Amino acid sequence: MGNVVYKLTSKEIQSLMAQTTFETTKLPQGMKARTRYQNTVINIYSSGKVMFQGKNADQLASQLLPDKQSTTGKHTSSNTTSIQYNRFHCIGSDEAGSGDYFGPLTVCAAYVSQSHIKILKELGVDDSKKLNDTKIVDLAEQLITFIPHSLLTLDNVKYNERQSIGWSQVKMKAVLHNEAIKNVLQKIEQDQLDYIVIDQFAKREVYQHYALSALPFPDKTKFETKGESKSLAIAVASIISRYAFVKHMDHISKKLHMEIPKGASNKVDLIAAKVIQKYDIQQLDTISKKHFKNRDKAIHLMNQKYNK
């Protein structure tokens, strides 16, 4: 049995716990949560350390925590790069919505040539995580007019269907990234491509295992953590995917006549409970990711209200 240990921030722990159901009561002192997932025991401690225990502990940890390096020394970092991507013609890909209870999963691949670099810098293209929604929308609506791209949206109904038949979120993202990249390749002169750069959410071997189809140009394909800061192609893909997510969330808010929040916080639990109260659980499931623990928390809030 292998053991892998990570040190996580509170936000990273929240993101991990959103990916499957954890026990949070009747635990040993010092333990915050635990679960058994894919034949691996995951223990989260109050200190911020997370231990994966099991035959496939290392592989599962890489899937759930692709950007982290274990404190056990089993992982060697392959995320450093000396490639100056903005000097080359690149396809970049990124996604939005993966850590949000409400809303779809959106993935974009975008082709940025050297001729695009100057105008992108003048427009102020940057990592979408640093931009507010208004700036995201303004930038994206300009970018989609001249950047070859492919934008794919997995709505909540289809997301939940795939999750119910055993697809992990990592698999969904791998399939969507690969399809978006292949779509962009049909829109460009392929001899004018130097690199395909994927904002890393899983190690290469995990991505290849789940993608359902081969990498189009494996020798040209790179995986980069925090890729939006290393490649304008990823930054563009990040902005367009975030734009699609923001617009979809706006649509949900208008449809339900209430502000639907992003993320997976306690505020999200309260709004989810309000959706159940105003509509029903079926309506909630059409606009959310059912496997997030926010669903159970919302149901618990409703039960508390009516059992007083």
Swiss-Prot record:
Primary location class: cytoplasm
Sequence similarity: Belongs to the RNase HII family. RnhC subfamily.
Keyword list, A-Z: Cytoplasm, Endonuclease, Hydrolase, Magnesium, Metal-binding, Nuclease
Function of the molecule: Endonuclease that specifically degrades the RNA of RNA-DNA hybrids.
Gene3D superfamilies: Ribonuclease H-like superfamily/Ribonuclease H (3.30.420.10), TATA-Binding Protein (3.30.310.10)
PROSITE patterns (UniProt xref): RNASE_H_2
GO biological process: DNA replication, removal of RNA primer; mismatch repair
Note accompanying the cofactor annotation: Manganese or magnesium. Binds 1 divalent metal ion per monomer in the absence of substrate. May bind a second metal ion after substrate binding.
Binding site for a divalent metal cation: D94, E95, D199
CDD domains noted in UniProt: RNase_HII_bacteria_HIII_like (cd06590), RNAse_HIII_N (cd14796)
SUPFAM superfamilies to which the protein is assigned, alphabetical: Ribonuclease H-like
GO cellular component, one term: cytoplasm
Protein name, per record: Ribonuclease HIII
Annotated localization: Cytoplasm
Domain RNase H type-2 residue range list: 88-304
Lineage top rank: taxon: Bacteria
MF (Gene Ontology): magnesium ion binding; RNA binding; RNA-DNA hybrid ribonuclease activity
Cofactor (UniProt): Mn(2+); Mg(2+)
Taxonomic lineage: Bacteria, Bacillati, Bacillota, Bacilli, Bacillales
InterPro entries reported in the protein's UniProt record: RNase_HII/HIII, RNase_HII/HIII_dom, RNase_HIII, RNase_HIII_N, RNaseH-like_sf, RNaseH_sf, TBP_dom_sf
Enzyme Commission number(s): 3.1.26.4
Reaction catalysis annotation: Endonucleolytic cleavage to 5'-phosphomonoester
